[in-house]
Every structure is written in C-alpha cells, then in structure tokens.
Amino acid sequence: MLVAAAADRNKGPILEVLQQYVDPAAPKVRALEVASGTGQHCAHFAQALPNLHLVPSELDPHSRQSISAYISHWSLSNVEQPRTLDSSKSWETWGFSPNSLHLIICINMIHITEPSCTQGLFKGAGHLLMPGGVLFTYGPYSVNGILTPQSNVDFNISLKRRNPAWGIWDTSDLQNLATTCGMSLERMVDMPANNKCLIFRKK
C-alpha cells in the first residue's frame, strides 16, 4: 500500500467537512472519488461513514493497486474496486448514468492537472450528480485574484515550472465554470496548511 504523508495529515480534517454532506439517515449515499491517489482518503472516509458507497478512480496503475490493497486490508464492503478514469474525457466514458450520484469528491487534483481535467470534472459533475448533489473539492485556491500566503505563491510558481499548464485556480473561475455546468459554489471552508474545501451544489 502506498502512503502519502499529506493524505495522512489531511484525511481527518477533510472528513470533518465531508461528513456534513453525507446524510446519516440515507441508506446509501453513492459517491465517486476522482483522482483517488493512494487510496488513503477513500479508506478513511468509508470506515467512518458506513452508508457511503464509494467508487474510487485513478489513471495511474500503481495507485489503483494501492487503492485495491487498502480495500482488502480494511475489508471495505462499501468501496468498489478502482476504475480507470480520465476526467479530461467525456463524462459518457466514466461508466455512470446521468443523475446517479449524490456526491463527487476530488482532492488535490485541480492544481496539478491541465485545465481540461478540471473542466471535464465540472462537466461530469453537472451531468452525473443528482439534482441537489454535491461536488466536493479540496486543495489550494486563490480567492478573487488574491493568493495567500507566500508559501502558496511559491508553490504556484514551482507548479508552473514543472508544467506551464498546471497551477492554482481562482475560486471565481471555478464558480464561473460551475455555473456553466448547472452548479453553484455554496460554501468555502478554510482548512489547515492554507487549503480550502469548496462545496458546489447542482441545481
């Protein structure tokens, strides 16, 4: 099983916010996690939220193997085997029916992928979420053109050195993208390590 130190640090704080969007009275809350990484997040969420039926996804085969190992290690009956999913491709290739998901989760992907991946994520959410469903994203963001603190500014510079198409998105740009996909930015939650959770709800 792969272990990412950042995932170990942030999985608890993220869960505290995420659980507010998983109705404990619902028999099954169907969720897709896009860019699941090592599998630490989905394993942690699934253990804490037994009615969350989670479908992880990853492009990287080593990460998919790690996700499967976490599922096996914790005997997680509410997590499916990981799917190969490229969010830059049409939502019709993702393997879900329209309006079939309560929740889509995306942690630390937006700033380290090309814009087509984020655009595809939002388009997919607009089609696949049920009315009232939530797109839940986590990562560093600038707000109305202002990126703070200096460590995030430096991080953004380093990202663009690695790939000019990468970089930290502004919340206003994501809000505009959400609007075109039939969603709205409902809430923004400040998190440890200068990150944020953004909650987009489908109309």
Curated annotation (Swiss-Prot):
Pfam families reported in the protein's UniProt record: DUF938
InterPro entries from the UniProt entry: DUF938, SAM-dependent_MTases_sf
Organism superkingdom: Eukaryota
Cysteines joined through disulfide linkages: none
Sequence similarity: Belongs to the UPF0585 family.
Protein name: Methyltransferase-like 26
